Amino acid sequence: MDQAKKYANLLDSFRSSTEDILLLERLEVSDKPIYVLDSSFNPPHFAHLGMCLSIPKGSQLLLLLSITNADKPVAPAAFNERILMMEKLKTLIHNCTVSVAICKHALFVDKCRSISNKLGPREQVYLVGFDTLIRILDCKYYKEKAMQQVLQPFFSCSQILCFSREVDGTTTDDQAQYLEKIKKSLLPNIPSQWSEKIKLTKLKGNVGFGVSSTRARQAIISGDEETQRKIIPQEILNVIKVIQPYRHR
């Protein structure tokens, strides 16, 4: 696929540049909040699409891929192949203006700063799953400084919209209780006022139930087409069949 080579070249140029974030599509200047779906997109699935379709009509949305991950090694699919899949995901989102973006930062506070520098000082709303929320508030990622000190700038200009769904043995009740513990200052190193910046919501219907990138990859590698269709939009499956990003597994 010529597009795969194009994105491979783009990534090479980006890595060697002084830029720390790159938007593949231009967004109009605005003072309205910008929504950010930061994910590995490995591959994009129905839960990703459901999150994107849940934001207010007419909003601006970044599909953000970090080429530096805090705790996940680089594995198939390659980054240029993920961008191809992200661009296809973008075509399925009709309620807002979307740009695919790549960045060099692993931590959300650094991503937030880069977006502010690129798009101006506007509120950012991060669309995350519960597993990502837990990682954002995990002290192990902030060893050099206290987590409160590092994350305060992030929460001063950002909100987290956390999509609660039962996955990996964690119930929605467990997730709601976690936020209640933050509100009541029952979790060490997490100020209670941060709970005002975190909102729990749910995807409509059964969208996202049992969906994860790990399960999607397993279904692709094993050839389980029925599970693939349940987890991954057909348009993205069509791209996967052409570029075969998991062929080396």
Swiss-Prot record:
Per UniProt, what is one GO molecular function of this protein?
Answer: ATP binding
- Gene Ontology annotations of biological process type: NAD biosynthetic process
SUPFAM superfamilies, per database record: Nucleotidylyl transferase
Q: Binding residues for NAD(+), per the UniProt record?
A: S40, F41, T97, G129, D131, R165, N206
Entries under InterPro entries matching the protein: NadD/NMNAT, Rossmann-like_a/b/a_fold
Gene Ontology CC annotations of this record: cytoplasm; cytosol; nucleus
This protein's pathway reads: Cofactor biosynthesis; NAD(+) biosynthesis; NAD(+) from nicotinamide D-ribonucleotide: step 1/1
What keywords would UniProt list here?
A: ATP-binding, Cytoplasm, NAD, Nucleotide-binding, Nucleotidyltransferase, Nucleus, Pyridine nucleotide biosynthesis, Transferase
Q: Does the keyword Zinc-finger apply?
A: no
What reaction does this catalyse? Answer: beta-nicotinamide D-ribonucleotide + ATP + H(+) = diphosphate + NAD(+)
Any idea which positions bind ATP? H48, T214, R215, A216, R217
- Where in or outside the cell? Cytoplasm; Nucleus
Q: What class of enzyme is it?
A: transferase
* EC numbers: 2.7.7.1
Q: Which family does it belong to?
A: Belongs to the eukaryotic NMN adenylyltransferase family. POF1 subfamily.
Question: PANTHER family from the xrefs?
Answer: NICOTINAMIDE MONONUCLEOTIDE ADENYLYLTRANSFERASE
Protein function? Catalyzes the formation of NAD(+) from nicotinamide mononucleotide (NMN) and ATP. Involved in the salvage pathway for NAD(+) biosynthesis via NMN.
- What is the name of the protein in this document? Putative nicotinamide mononucleotide adenylyltransferase
What is the species of this protein?
Answer: Schizosaccharomyces pombe (strain 972 / ATCC 24843)
Native organism taxonomy:
Eukaryota, Fungi, Dikarya, Ascomycota, Taphrinomycotina
